[in-house]
């Protein structure tokens, strides 16, 4: 009996080695490192969920085609195990548990949105599973003391602060009147906090502070108030659907405002969807193809834009670019750790200091990227062709800001 037991233990040990992972090691089968991801393929975040998945997949293919990930003198390829989180926080948390407990995944990629990242982070943290995420920008993610969460993007409160600074500058340095309407999700509320901070810093006044409806399909009540009280700047954050709704109703109601600052213009393909109706909208972005960052995998932003467009038949929004950057960060960390031990790779992630086509990546103590500023672009049209032009920061600007926005009667 004892001999049989010893033999079974030996067989199990060999089997575990062949599988290539233990309780502290990444899911490695042969020469494949499997990462886990729950992304929104259905539900209200499905558009950006698709961008996220496409960004991950493009980087996986590029890294694998260029020799993969080198650990211990051997080359490994990336693969991603996907599930649809249905744009639902509870489902996202359940899938994180499933990926870790049932599928044996030891390294995670983030979902789309701050809310879903917030749902998954406690699960990955409890299990000491590193998660490199690209689409959860809420600053509250980085104040929880998480040690296994790393975000390649800039925090949400930084998205539109610079728009208020620009409005004040264009107002001769004097405070401005601000109207704002926000979705009630974690990301948008953090953008709102950034606006409140900017208003306080510049002594500007918030004259409208509205909540967007849950379905993001009507903001006429807010726009009627804007027409009545005439703010200097209108700020809107409601993910892709909110951006499209805002432009549609602003044009229908002929709402004149000197500055319109928004989020998710590129993810919603605003310039393409609404054309000249979207002209002069000022948009926060984590990335733009014209920026000068470089790496050895995608070259620069223009090359990434070309490669992504060839693969998926549409131009990449920043949600795709930052998702690709997450894979480059993982590759770098695995190779510096020279190990599949989760703690060693976690420690390597914490010491990340690199440049990618998307931007510089260096993590603060809370896991946020401290090395990359936001950019602002403005939708500009020549004839019927509309595109995004970077207007801030000045060092990357490809066009001058048009301010104030011409009234609808003159457009």
Description of each model-found segment:
Residues 1-34, 408-411:
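Short, low-complexity disordered leader/linker segments with a strong preference
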Residues 26, 33, 350-411:
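Solvent-exposed, acidic/polar segments of extracytosolic/periplasmic ligand-binding ectodomains
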Residues 27-28, 34, 47-54, 66-143, ...:
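Beta-alpha junction/loop-to-helix N-cap segments that form part of ligand/metal-binding clefts
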Residues 29, 33-57, 83-89, 112-113, ...:
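Extracytoplasmic "Venus flytrap"
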Residues 90, 105-209, 258-283:
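Extracytoplasmic ligand/sensor domains, especially the bilobed periplasmic-binding protein
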Residues 114-125, 231-253, 326-327:
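Hydrophobic alpha-helical
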Residues 196, 240-243, 292-351:
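Extracellular/periplasmic ligand-binding modules, especially the Venus flytrap/periplasmic-binding
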Residues 250-324, 391-411:
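Extracellular/periplasmic periplasmic-binding protein-like sensory domains
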């Amino acid at each position: 009996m004892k001999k049989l037991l010893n033999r079974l233990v030996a067989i199990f040990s060999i089997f575990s080695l062949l599988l290539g992972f233990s309780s502290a090691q990444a899911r490695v089968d042969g020469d494949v490192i499997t990462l886990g991801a729950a992304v929104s393929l259905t539900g209200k975040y499905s558009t950006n969920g698709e961008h996220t998945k496409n960004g991950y997949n493009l980087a996986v293919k590029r890294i694998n085609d260029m020799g993969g990930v080198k650990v211990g003198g051997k080359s490994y390829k990336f693969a991603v195990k996907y599930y649809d989180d249905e744009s639902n926080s509870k489902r996202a948390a359940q899938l994180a548990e499933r990926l870790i407990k049932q599928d044996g995944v030891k390294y995670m990629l983030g979902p789309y949105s701050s809310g879903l990242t917030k749902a998954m982070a406690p699960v990955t943290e409890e299990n000491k599973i590193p998660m490199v995420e690209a689409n959860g920008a809420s600053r509250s993610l980085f104040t929880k003391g998480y040690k296994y969460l790393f975000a390649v993007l800039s925090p949400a409160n930084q998205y539109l602060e610079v728009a208020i600074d620009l409005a004040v500058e264009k107002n001769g340095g004097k405070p401005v009147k601000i109207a704002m309407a926000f979705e009630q999700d974690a990301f948008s509320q953090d953008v709102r906090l950034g606006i409140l901070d900017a208003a306080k810093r510049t002594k500007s006044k918030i004259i409208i502070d509205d909540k967007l409806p849950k379905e993001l399909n009507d903001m006429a009540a807010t726009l009627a108030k804007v027409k009545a009280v005439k703010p200097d700047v209108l700020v809107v954050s409601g993910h892709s659907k909110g951006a499209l709704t805002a432009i549609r109703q602003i044009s229908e109601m002929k709402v004149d405002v000197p500055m319109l600052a928004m989020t998710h213009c590129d993810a919603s393909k605003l310039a393409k969807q609404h054309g000249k109706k979207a002209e002069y909208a000022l948009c926060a972005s984590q990335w733009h193809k014209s920026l000068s960052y470089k790496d050895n995998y995608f070259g620069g932003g223009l090359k990434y834009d070309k490669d992504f467009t060839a693969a998926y038949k549409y131009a990449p929004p920043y949600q795709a670019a930052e998702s690709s950057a997450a894979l480059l960060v993982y590759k770098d960390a695995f190779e510096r750790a020279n190990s599949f031990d989760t703690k060693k790779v976690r420690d390597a992630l914490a010491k990340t200091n690199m440049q990618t086509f998307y931007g510089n990546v260096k993590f603060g103590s809370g896991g946020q990227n401290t090395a990359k500023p936001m950019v602002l672009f403005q939708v500009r049209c020549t004839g019927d062709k509309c595109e995004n032009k970077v207007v801030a920061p000045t060092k990357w600007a490809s066009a001058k800001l048009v301010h104030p926005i011409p009234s609808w009667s003159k457009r």
